[in-house]
Amino acid sequence: MARDLKFTRNIGIAAHIDAGKTTTTERILYYAGVNHKIGEVHEGGATMDWMAQEQERGITITSAATTVGWKYRDNQYHVNIIDTPGHVDFTVEVNRSLRVLDGLVFLFSAVDGVEPQSETNWRLANNYKVARLGFVNKMDRSGADFLNVCKQVKEMLGSNAVPLQLPIGSEDNFQGVVDLVNNRAIVWNEADKGMTFTEVPIPADMVDETLEYREKLLEAVADYDETLMEKFFEDPNSISETEILTALRKAVLDMKIVPMLCGSSFKNKGVQTMLDYVMELLPSPLDKDDLVGINPDTDKEVVRKPVETDPFCALAFKIATDPFVGRLCFVRSYSGLLESGSYVYNTRSGNKERISRIFQMHANKQNQIDRLHCGDIGAVVGFKDIKTGDTLCDEKNKIILESMVFPEPVIGYAIEPKTQADVDKMGVAIAKLVEEDPTLHVHTDQETGQTILRGMGELHLEIIIDRMRREFKVEINQGAPQVAYKESLTKSTEHREVFKKQSGGRGKFADIVFELSPREDDKLGLEFENKIVGGVIPKEFIPSIQKGFEEAMKNGVIAGFPVESMKVRLNHGSFHDVDSDALSFELAARQGFKEAAKNAGAKIMEPIMSVEVVTPEEYTGPVTGDLNRRRGMMKGMDSKMGAQVIKADVPLSELFGYVTDLRTISSGRATASLTFSHYEFVPANLAETIVAKVKGTAVSK
């Protein structure tokens, strides 16, 4: 029998690093009866942090998925939960999770409030239009301030944050919450690790505050739902609990209100009420808009409804390698039904592939199931050719869904196998890791022959190299971190390239005339415009010319850095009946690019990081002075909870070892967060140094 989708929730848990995401998920597993003991992150025992590297470092690296049941108002809910990383180096995991989720629980630390990665993840959630509620965690910590965090969410994230609860006590005295929707107070029983809770009278010293914030809640709801406005002005108390919840749910789905809750996951308080509000307020797959895609055969829009009677359609959002079952593909099903043993069509590869097994995931463990229902999240085995972002569908009812866009890597390491025995193993390891992680790139330096591994940050690449050693038993040497510089064209130029080779027998010949210029839009890659008329170059050679330019972009003309974007307009050319072939035209394009780019004003670009430093006031001078020495561009300064928050844009090349240096400058009291911001042109004097370093020559003074 088909499951009622009204009672399905696909939710994520997201936040800045150390806000308590994994601890919260562990409590959910415990209270939902999935785990019979609580796994603690600080002890390396969290179920959801299953990788050795996660348990050692106490951080989440991959998005772990799990499924739980939750009873609310006599209905049994089916909840798929994805616990995502908070560290900036693993934003890709947040990105691909948000693409397939319907709702989000966004955690904030009651002490630290809105932090840099909170802002990044919040923007990603806005991009994917994911409805959310806020959970202010760590109310037991010194300096906890629920209402101040609500204010920050409103001001810094530009959202309509509305408290649904008030904390009873804080810091060591945090006991429970007052629920403003139903006007009741709840305290948790510590004897059974918060498994049970008791309703108590609202504390006398909180009655006035409760009235004030309940009125604010009613006003926010009445503002959204005009039918309640008259009631609000006549008698706010005449608005029933059902009316509040109905209007609140609509406002949350419409992304007009972010309900704010509070608790302490570590102290086992507030998690069950948060889960109840997930069921009450966050969307089911039925609440989302119908899915619109493109039929690849007709190029026309097609619509899929979240019903099992519609043709099957799903998105592959993650690939992982499991030591026991092999390649696992995580999918979100949007319509239809997927049964074990059935065939699906991949619209990218054009292949029909058999699904051998389907699993419901619980961290790194699998529970085999017979079918994946519409609106569900699961993992499947059986694909020979699958990539993150692929659309899977019924072959007779094809559809392509919008894929995912991932950020470009900004840092690289040169790596090499330690022994001859490690050569093949390294190749296998890299192939599997690149397949899993769209932000991990690998290429071979043509000058040195070295393998360059590129990723989102030092921690990202450290984890990758550690996984190569542990999972694939590869011993490797690694070089110092390298900045992922790029080259960019700044002006247009026209060029003719004649490629001719004659060495007895059939020769090689290709003649192309093209204009090379910067792209006018902000997209990456090659924009190729074919203006050939009259068959002066046969159309079967045009794809080879385009391929030649795409290959040439991988190595720029200044220092061999990749050219991130450019436009080529192919205007004219000629061919030879016997000597011209596809390879001749591809080589003509490659050679032509090298010559033309010299006249197209190529310049080197470097990655710029957005740096946020939180420091005690007495270290403000030394910290800003150090950032200036690192070519930092100051963006502003704020006060936050008795500390100074310094924001600056700083080139990545100046930031290696920065966290260690900052500890020295501030006697260990300042902290920094680094996020990739954008690319900028390198100053001319530094560009000369970079080129000299790459080419191994001295810089002329």
From Swiss-Prot:
The gene is fusA. GO terms for biological process: ribosome disassembly. GO terms for molecular function: GTP binding; GTPase activity; translation elongation factor activity. Keywords: Cytoplasm, Elongation factor, GTP-binding, Nucleotide-binding, Protein biosynthesis. It holds the Pfam family EFG_IV. Belongs to the TRAFAC class translation factor GTPase superfamily. Classic translation factor GTPase family. EF-G/EF-2 subfamily. InterPro entries: EFG_II, EFG_III, EFG_III/V, EFG_IV, EFG_V, EFG_V-like, EFTu-like_2, G_TR_CS. This is Elongation factor G. SMART domains: EFG_C, EFG_IV. CDD domains: EF-G, EFG_III, EFG_mtEFG1_IV, EFG_mtEFG_C, EFG_mtEFG_II. It comes from Cytophaga hutchinsonii (strain ATCC 33406 / DSM 1761 / CIP 103989 / NBRC 15051 / NCIMB 9469 / D465). Residues 6-286 form the tr-type G domain.
